């Protein structure tokens, strides 16, 4: 079994920079690929990320715009948005060695196809081993070496364990799992719940309402997870409950801050600040997938209706509060 001594990180944004630093701290030989020439040059010359001011790249991290060079690593972290993962995985297919792990680090579901991230990798790069990294982790915390725990999942237990070992450092603790679907499902679902929680906070509905929204959001996550084959222990773990708890409690979460802005009465364009949160794309897809399995998800339904302009925030909240009373699950 490979020790994955060389790791490439594809994507030089905040999360990619944080994971590159983590891999370097874990003693790996790290290459950081960035497609934007201006940002790549800035990283190479200043060693400082525009997205994480004050955070400097380790001297050992090599910055490149050459995808073929990055593809020579023993494992690749794909730190690109969920909706562009397909194009990156397709480009990698002819460049990677057989059975190279491609680890998705985005939390989402592809719009239009309803594909999870590892499904896209399997489809577009059949030579690769699909894997997923997810859990409660903000880029700024990880980059600064603050204690963080995540989950890395692959269908092969030995591969998952080896990848976790390769990324393990004094402050970054990966747990390993073979429940690939459960790990990526939790990360995608919490995006939508975090928007809902942000709306509650932005509307100043109080701590009680926020706690209720987060708890019932977790109920929806579990329902959806069961319908799509996730293990209950995964949903109760870092990539499920852990990520949900974090992202429903702080504006550090882009989805939560997006929801807060909506709750304050801002339009979607105003709330996005030039970059839509991943939950915006996930909400309608999540709802379609839930309906296909007959899963009741009232919070997700309300969020999707708000984002599609079908309901105002107050009407959506009233709709949730006036649903028929029922026994707690």
Curated annotation (Swiss-Prot):
GO terms for molecular function: glycerol-3-phosphate dehydrogenase [NAD(P)+] activity; NAD binding. Sn-glycerol 3-phosphate binds at residues 107, 135, 137, 190, 243, 253-255. Pfam families: NAD_Gly3P_dh_C, NAD_Gly3P_dh_N. The keyword Lipid biosynthesis applies. Pathway: Membrane lipid metabolism; glycerophospholipid metabolism. Its EC number is 1.1.1.94. GO terms for cellular component: cytosol. Transmembrane segments: none annotated. One of its GO terms (biological process) is glycerophospholipid metabolic process. The keyword Cell wall biogenesis/degradation does not apply. NADPH binds at residues 15, 35, 107, 139, 254, 276, 278. It is an enzyme of class 1 (oxidoreductase). InterPro entries: 6-PGluconate_DH-like_C_sf, 6PGD_dom2, G3P_DH_NAD-dep, G3P_DH_NAD-dep_C, G3P_DH_NAD-dep_N, NAD(P)-bd_dom_sf. It catalyses: sn-glycerol 3-phosphate + NAD(+) = dihydroxyacetone phosphate + NADH + H(+); sn-glycerol 3-phosphate + NADP(+) = dihydroxyacetone phosphate + NADPH + H(+). The active site is at residue 190. Keywords: Cytoplasm, Lipid biosynthesis, Lipid metabolism, NAD, NADP, Nucleotide-binding, Oxidoreductase, Phospholipid biosynthesis, Phospholipid metabolism. Catalyzes the reduction of the glycolytic intermediate dihydroxyacetone phosphate (DHAP) to sn-glycerol 3-phosphate (G3P), the key precursor for phospholipid synthesis. Belongs to the NAD-dependent glycerol-3-phosphate dehydrogenase family. This is Glycerol-3-phosphate dehydrogenase [NAD(P)+]. It comes from Rhodopseudomonas palustris (strain BisB5).
């Amino acid at each position: 079994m490979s020790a994955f001594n060389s790791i490439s990180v594809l994507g030089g944004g905040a999360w990619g920079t944080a994971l590159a630093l983590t891999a370097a701290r874990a003693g790996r030989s790290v290459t950081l690929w960035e497609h934007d020439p201006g940002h790549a040059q800035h990283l190479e010359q200043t060693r400082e990320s525009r997205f994480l001011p004050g955070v400097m790249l380790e001297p050992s991290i090599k910055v490149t715009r050459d995808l073929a060079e990055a593809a020579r690593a023993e494992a690749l972290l794909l730190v690109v948005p969920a909706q562009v993962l397909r194009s990156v995985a397709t480009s990698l297919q002819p460049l990677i060695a057989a059975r190279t792990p491609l680890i998705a680090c985005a939390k989402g579901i592809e719009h239009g196809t309803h594909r999870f991230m590892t499904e896209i990798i399997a489809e577009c790069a059949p030579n690769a081993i699909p894997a997923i990294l997810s859990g409660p982790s903000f880029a700024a915390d990880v980059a600064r070496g603050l204690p963080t725990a995540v989950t890395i999942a692959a269908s092969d237990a030995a591969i998952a364990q080896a990848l976790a070992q390769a990324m393990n450092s004094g402050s970054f603790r990966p747990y390993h799992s073979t429940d690939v679907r459960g790990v990526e499902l939790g990360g995608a679902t919490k995006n939508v719940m975090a928007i809902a929680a942000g709306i509650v906070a932005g509307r100043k509905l109080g701590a009680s309402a926020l706690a209720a929204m987060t708890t019932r959001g977790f109920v929806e996550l579990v329902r959806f997870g069961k319908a799509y084959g996730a293990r209950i222990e995964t949903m109760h773990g870092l990539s499920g409950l852990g990520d949900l708890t974090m992202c429903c409690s702080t504006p550090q979460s882009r989805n939560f801050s997006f929801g807060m802005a909506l709750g304050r009465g801002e339009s979607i364009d105003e709330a996005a600040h030039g970059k839509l949160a991943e939950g915006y794309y996930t909400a309608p897809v999540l709802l379609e997938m839930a309906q296909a399995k007959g899963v009741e998800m009232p919070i997700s339904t309300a969020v999707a209706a708000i984002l599609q302009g079908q309901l105002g925030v107050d009407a959506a909240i009233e709709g949730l509060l006036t649903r028929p009373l029922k026994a707690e699950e």
